[in-house]
Amino acid sequence: MKTLLAVLLAACVLTQVLSAPSNEQRVRRNMIRGRPRGGMKKTPPMSSVSHMINFDNVVSSTFTQTLDHFDSSVGKTFQQRYYHNNQWYKAGGPAFLMLGGEGPESSYWVSYPGLEITNLAAKQGAWVFDIEHRFYGETHPTSDMSVPNLKYLSSAQAIEDAAAFIKAMTAKFPQLANAKWVTFGGSYSGALAAWTRAKHPELVYAAVGSSGPVQAEVDFKEYLEVVQNSITRNSTECAASVTQGFNLVASLLQTSDGRKQLKTAFHLCQDIQMDDKSLKYFWETVYSPYMEVVQYSGDAAGSFATQLTISHAICRYHINTKSTPLQKLKQVNDYFNQVSGYFGCNDIDYNGFISFMKDETFGEAQSDRAWVWQTCTEFGYYQSTSSATAGPWFGGVSNLPAQYYIDECTAIYGAAYNSQEVQTSVDYTNQYYGGRDNLNTDRILLPNGDIDPWHALGKLTSSNSNIVPVVINGTAHCADMYGASSLDSMYLTNARQRISDVLDGWLHAN
């Protein structure tokens, strides 16, 4: 962007691990363009929750999908993975479709009891479906992920996939001939849920798009502004300590002895290189735990519910006056890695990362290569330090400019993917979907947590009574999608009720 067992997190944010010459594992940083490994919509391994699920009605299958919905001359198809469950279906009930996003899907979202979508399905008597996004998980539309093939990867194609799927399922299951279809999603797929309703109102009756960044933006400087503000909101003392630490890192980078201290503190696999790209890649590694903790703080998703929260994973260390500023950063990094199950040295090899991302097979780099492609060709979403407020707080406005990420587009996919192309693509995305201010649709619910950095690109207000933003005080990314917990705030509880009430009103209006 979806209380779960404590083992959930390790599989949700699986880290890319390589063998190091010293026999110590190399841990590649977890956050890539705001996306943790496994995707932004947290999902546990089914083995950890299967004992809580009734699988009698859960079906996993594939659907013959069109490769190019906009050029019939291509004439190719592929097998798209999907899941469905009619456990809660009642005659005349609606169909709920969870849209896959930038990671693999599983039967979790159609079967796990107590989730927002399954609770709503039980209330409305809905048949629940989940379709995996092309080029993610086991859905491989082409033989590899070369640039010519990646041109079939876009949100527009994914929306047409959903439309074709709805038509096919309506034909396959006569019970659904007159069903009202509701699309659901979280994070990128939350935006997809809203856009699918907008592009296909004849097929999609309503949408619930949780934490959907419906505004594309090249220089997403607001992301780190929200990280700063969310930590400050938790504790001004903590925030002062965090920025003190980041600015100390900037100072230590200037000397050989300082860089040695940083290598030891952050347990780096390599010496810090002073070329521009390597330094920026190092900064991404430093920021990554803070970004991920804030993005999911308090979500009822494994360790983020209690351990990886702003209070426990960040401020608990930064208000410890017995530690030095550098020790505090180290303690946050060590604790994050320990809880997440990441053991080994932190890999800061920029060139190695680019080589990893250039892998064209459906292998270890699959989801990262696909998601970065979409940022380069549609969305931007580049979490920069260019903000006049957040930049200095994070140790320097030039530490991570948007251009750094654009240069990665060029390095990974080729010279055609340059600044002009990225900006043109982002402008087109906003024109095609309407951006935040011109969503041309109705009957969409748009929940957002106000400590989530992604809410800055969401739709938070609306003059249209049938476009319903639900801003949830003190919650993070996709918080509404998970199961209710005793730790939930009244704001989150009330938001889930609001979503349920609005959707109920729409479904029974006619």
Curated annotation (Swiss-Prot):
Entry EC number(s): 3.4.-.-
Gene Ontology molecular functions: dipeptidyl-peptidase activity; serine-type exopeptidase activity
Pfam families assigned: Peptidase_S28
Family that this chain belongs to: Belongs to the peptidase S28 family.
Residues bearing attached sugar chains per UniProt: N234, N473
Keywords of the record: Glycoprotein, Hydrolase, Protease, Serine protease, Signal
Full protein name: Putative serine protease K12H4.7
Keyword Endoplasmic reticulum appears in the UniProt entry: no
Signal peptide as annotated in the record: 1-19
GO biological process: innate immune response; proteolysis
Catalytic residues (positions): S187, D452, H477
